[in-house]
């Protein structure tokens, strides 16, 4: 059997999308390839402090804001099936995201979905996930379900989502504590909840000892790949961090790490100095390239930090031997990212999958 080596590299050092005034953050991107959109453009959804924004691009690099799709919402995920677009997001009360930065304000959220046939007009919202189990809630910080990710499993649909909260002192706000699953026979639900998390923080885990963060899962070559941003304390830097961990699973429930260390983490300086957060990932079978949009933070505390969106690329190479580290540049994908992708930042992180 052939072995797949995945060579990960940043598209560029700088972000491709920055927050616009007055919001200090633009976060949690989810995107569609142009061939899957009626207008032939790339579409990307992300949130600022006011709600979920939609952006358009001709090349996947240069983006323009189209509109605010949902107010008082965050952490979107876009899913397409048979001509219908499903936009999932975490919904909260008016201005609650701003008030949550102050002490003694409990959080409360649920996950909604809206549908569209043309990415222009959207249906009324439908609630699909609410906090039900004890591990969805925290007596001190509130009730939270967030970071939806829908994957089709045969005739069923599996919703991965984050639940509950853990306070991160140097950030001054909470992050998701667990990751869990619900299943349904329709993208609109009703969903049956798993009674336990599938991923939780572990004090012995150097890259996930504070919170499980979020996960995006995709099916690839008969297995399921997971991209988790674990929340952890860095004892060397004496601060919290977040980094993207690369996982795999046979059943989509029991995950193991492909790489023992993160494939993408904070740099200690620049726009992604402190935290690399949630991402969205899609794979081009024709070009053998993973495209991963992520958001990152420059400073921990909410009064100082800003978040922007970057691009990470994984090129797949197959070999029948162990091989050596690739030095090849990524070639230009058709109908995806234009010529600069072949000039991606040369630093490479290698992943192996047998």
Task: Report the location of each language-model feature.
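Intrinsically disordered, Lys/Arg-rich low-complexity segments
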Residues: 325-354
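Extracellular glycan/ECM-engagement signal in secreted proteins
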Residues: 279
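Beta-rich carbohydrate-recognition and catalytic domains
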Residues: 1-146, 151-209, 218-274, 284-331
């Amino acid at each position: 059997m052939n072995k797949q080596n995945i060579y990960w590299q940043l598209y560029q050092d700088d972000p491709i999308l920055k927050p616009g005034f007055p919001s200090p953050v633009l976060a949690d991107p989810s995107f569609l390839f142009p061939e899957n959109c009626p207008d032939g453009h790339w579409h990307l959804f992300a949130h600022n402090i006011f709600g979920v924004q939609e952006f358009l691009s001709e090349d996947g690099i240069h983006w323009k804001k189209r509109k605010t799709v949902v107010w008082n919402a965050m952490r979107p995920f876009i899913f397409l099936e048979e001509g219908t677009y499903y936009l999932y997001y975490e919904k909260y009360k008016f201005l609650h995201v701003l008030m949550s930065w102050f002490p003694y304000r409990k959080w409360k959220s649920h996950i909604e979905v809206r549908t569209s046939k043309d990415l222009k007009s959207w249906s009324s919202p439908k609630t699909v996930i609410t906090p039900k189990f004890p591990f969805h809630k925290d007596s001190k910080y509130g009730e939270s379900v967030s970071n939806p990710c829908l994957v089709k499993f045969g005739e069923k649909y599996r919703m991965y989502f984050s639940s509950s909260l853990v306070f991160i002192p140097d950030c001054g706000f909470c992050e998701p504590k667990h990751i869990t699953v619900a299943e349904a026979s329709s993208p609109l639900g009703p969903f049956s909840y798993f009674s336990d998390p599938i991923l939780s923080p572990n004090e012995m885990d150097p890259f996930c000892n504070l919170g499980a963060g979020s996960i995006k899962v995709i099916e690839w070559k008969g297995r399921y790949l997971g991209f988790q941003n674990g929340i952890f304390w860095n004892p060397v830097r004496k601060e919290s961090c977040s980094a993207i961990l690369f996982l795999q699973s046979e059943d989509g429930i029991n995950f193991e790490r492909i790489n023992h260390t993160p494939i993408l983490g904070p740099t200690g300086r620049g726009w992604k100095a402190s935290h690399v957060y949630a991402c969205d990932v899609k794979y081009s079978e024709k070009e053998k390239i993973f495209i991963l949009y992520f958001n990152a933070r420059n400073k921990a505390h909410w009064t100082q930090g800003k978040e922007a969106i970057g691009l990470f690329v994984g090129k797949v190479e197959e070999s029948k031997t162990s091989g050596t580290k690739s030095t090849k540049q990524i070639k230009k994908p058709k109908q995806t990212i234009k010529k600069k992708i072949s000039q991606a930042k040369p630093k490479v992180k290698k992943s192996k999958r047998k």
